[in-house]
Amino acid sequence: GADEMCPPGWSSNGVYCYMLFKEPKTWDEAEKFCNKQGKDGHLLSIESKKEEILVDIVVSENIGKMYKIWTGLSERSKEQHCSSRWSDGSFFRSYEIAIRYSECFVLEKQSVFRTWVATPCENTFPFMCKYPVPR
Protein backbone atom coordinates (compact mmCIF):
# COMPACT_ATOMS: atom_id res chain seq x y z
CA GLY A 1 0.00 0.00 0.00
CA ALA A 2 0.88 3.67 0.08
CA ASP A 3 2.27 3.34 3.60
CA GLU A 4 5.23 1.22 2.49
CA MET A 5 7.24 4.30 1.54
CA CYS A 6 6.94 5.78 5.03
CA PRO A 7 8.57 4.34 8.17
CA PRO A 8 6.56 1.87 10.27
CA GLY A 9 3.92 3.67 12.32
CA TRP A 10 3.72 6.66 9.98
CA SER A 11 0.59 7.31 7.93
CA SER A 12 0.68 8.30 4.29
CA ASN A 13 -1.57 9.70 1.60
CA GLY A 14 0.97 8.71 -1.06
CA VAL A 15 2.40 12.23 -1.13
CA TYR A 16 3.40 12.88 2.49
CA CYS A 17 4.24 10.84 5.57
CA TYR A 18 2.48 11.89 8.79
CA MET A 19 3.07 11.06 12.43
CA LEU A 20 1.47 12.35 15.59
CA PHE A 21 3.77 12.83 18.59
CA LYS A 22 2.02 12.97 21.94
CA GLU A 23 4.87 14.36 24.03
CA PRO A 24 4.08 18.07 24.37
CA LYS A 25 6.69 20.51 23.09
CA THR A 26 6.84 24.24 22.41
CA TRP A 27 6.28 25.31 18.79
CA ASP A 28 10.01 25.80 18.18
CA GLU A 29 10.97 22.48 19.77
CA ALA A 30 8.28 20.68 17.77
CA GLU A 31 9.32 22.29 14.47
CA LYS A 32 13.00 21.42 15.09
CA PHE A 33 11.99 17.86 15.99
CA CYS A 34 9.97 17.55 12.77
CA ASN A 35 12.90 18.91 10.73
CA LYS A 36 14.89 15.85 11.85
CA GLN A 37 12.21 13.27 11.02
CA GLY A 38 12.69 13.28 7.26
CA LYS A 39 13.95 15.33 4.36
CA ASP A 40 11.94 18.59 4.30
CA GLY A 41 10.15 17.60 7.50
CA HIS A 42 7.99 20.25 9.17
CA LEU A 43 5.10 20.70 11.54
CA LEU A 44 1.78 19.86 9.98
CA SER A 45 0.44 22.02 7.18
CA ILE A 46 -2.99 21.37 5.70
CA GLU A 47 -3.30 22.25 2.04
CA SER A 48 -6.53 20.52 1.05
CA LYS A 49 -9.81 19.17 2.38
CA LYS A 50 -8.56 15.65 1.66
CA GLU A 51 -5.46 16.23 3.75
CA GLU A 52 -7.61 17.63 6.55
CA ILE A 53 -9.66 14.42 6.60
CA LEU A 54 -6.53 12.25 6.78
CA VAL A 55 -5.18 14.36 9.66
CA ASP A 56 -8.53 14.00 11.43
CA ILE A 57 -8.34 10.22 11.18
CA VAL A 58 -4.74 10.01 12.39
CA VAL A 59 -5.44 12.30 15.33
CA SER A 60 -8.72 10.70 16.40
CA GLU A 61 -7.10 7.24 16.31
CA ASN A 62 -4.40 8.52 18.66
CA ILE A 63 -5.93 11.14 20.94
CA GLY A 64 -9.69 10.80 20.79
CA LYS A 65 -12.33 13.46 20.43
CA MET A 66 -10.88 16.49 22.18
CA TYR A 67 -7.50 17.72 21.12
CA LYS A 68 -5.17 20.57 20.43
CA ILE A 69 -2.09 19.97 18.34
CA TRP A 70 0.50 22.40 17.03
CA THR A 71 0.37 23.18 13.34
CA GLY A 72 3.14 24.65 11.22
CA LEU A 73 1.31 27.95 11.10
CA SER A 74 2.91 30.91 12.81
CA GLU A 75 2.55 34.64 12.50
CA ARG A 76 6.32 35.02 12.59
CA SER A 77 6.75 33.88 9.03
CA LYS A 78 4.30 36.47 7.73
CA GLU A 79 5.48 38.47 4.77
CA GLN A 80 2.52 40.82 4.65
CA HIS A 81 -0.26 41.34 7.13
CA CYS A 82 -2.73 39.34 5.10
CA SER A 83 -0.75 36.20 4.41
CA SER A 84 0.36 33.54 6.82
CA ARG A 85 2.69 30.76 5.81
CA TRP A 86 3.14 27.25 7.09
CA SER A 87 6.59 26.37 8.39
CA ASP A 88 7.16 24.41 5.16
CA GLY A 89 6.65 27.59 3.13
CA SER A 90 3.23 26.86 1.65
CA PHE A 91 0.51 29.49 2.05
CA PHE A 92 -2.33 29.17 4.52
CA ARG A 93 -5.73 29.30 2.84
CA SER A 94 -8.50 28.92 5.35
CA TYR A 95 -11.16 31.09 6.82
CA GLU A 96 -11.69 29.05 9.98
CA ILE A 97 -9.14 31.01 11.89
CA ALA A 98 -9.19 32.93 15.13
CA ILE A 99 -6.32 35.40 15.02
CA ARG A 100 -5.50 37.13 18.25
CA TYR A 101 -2.24 38.73 19.23
CA SER A 102 -0.14 35.65 19.58
CA GLU A 103 2.06 33.94 17.15
CA CYS A 104 1.53 30.22 16.71
CA PHE A 105 -1.53 28.14 15.92
CA VAL A 106 -3.01 24.98 17.32
CA LEU A 107 -5.68 22.96 15.61
CA GLU A 108 -8.48 22.48 18.12
CA LYS A 109 -11.31 20.08 17.62
CA GLN A 110 -14.47 19.54 19.61
CA SER A 111 -16.42 16.70 18.00
CA VAL A 112 -17.07 18.22 14.56
CA PHE A 113 -16.02 21.85 14.84
CA ARG A 114 -12.46 22.50 13.86
CA THR A 115 -10.88 25.81 14.63
CA TRP A 116 -7.45 27.32 14.38
CA VAL A 117 -6.58 28.96 17.65
CA ALA A 118 -3.73 31.43 18.14
CA THR A 119 -1.68 30.42 21.15
CA PRO A 120 1.59 31.68 22.64
CA CYS A 121 4.44 29.76 20.99
CA GLU A 122 5.94 28.92 24.40
CA ASN A 123 2.94 26.75 25.33
CA THR A 124 3.45 23.02 24.91
CA PHE A 125 1.15 20.71 22.94
CA PRO A 126 1.29 17.40 21.12
CA PHE A 127 2.05 17.90 17.45
CA MET A 128 2.10 16.26 14.04
CA CYS A 129 5.06 16.09 11.68
CA LYS A 130 4.85 15.79 7.92
CA TYR A 131 7.44 15.24 5.21
CA PRO A 132 7.30 14.30 1.52
CA VAL A 133 7.26 10.56 0.77
CA PRO A 134 10.82 9.62 -0.23
CA ARG A 135 10.94 8.95 -3.96
From Swiss-Prot:
Keyword Disulfide bond: yes
Keyword annotations: Disulfide bond, Hemostasis impairing toxin, Platelet aggregation activating toxin, Platelet aggregation inhibiting toxin, Secreted, Signal, Toxin
Molecular-function annotations in GO: toxin activity
Superkingdom classification of source: Eukaryota
Domain C-type lectin: 13-130
Keyword Transport: no
GO-annotated cellular components: extracellular region
Tissue: Expressed by the venom gland.
Protein name stated in the entry: Snaclec echicetin subunit alpha
Gene3D superfamilies, per the entry: Mannose-Binding Protein A, subunit A
Disulfide bonds: C6-C17, C34-C129, C104-C121
Compartment(s) where it occurs, according to its Swiss-Prot or TrEMBL record: Secreted
InterPro entries membership: C-type_lectin-like, C-type_lectin-like/link_sf, C-type_lectin/snaclec_domain, CTDL_fold
Task performed by this protein: Binding of echicetin to GPIbalpha (GP1BA) receptor on platelets alone results in inhibition of platelet aggregation, while binding to both GP1BA receptor and IgMk promotes platelet aggregation and signal transduction.
A Pfam family it matches: Lectin_C
Quaternary context: Heterodimer of subunits alpha and beta; disulfide-linked.
PANTHER family: MANNOSE, PHOSPHOLIPASE, LECTIN RECEPTOR RELATED
Family assignment from sequence similarity: Belongs to the snaclec family.
Chief location: secreted
Signal peptide: 1-4
Lineage of the organism: Eukaryota, Metazoa, Chordata, Craniata, Vertebrata
Organism: Echis carinatus (Saw-scaled viper)
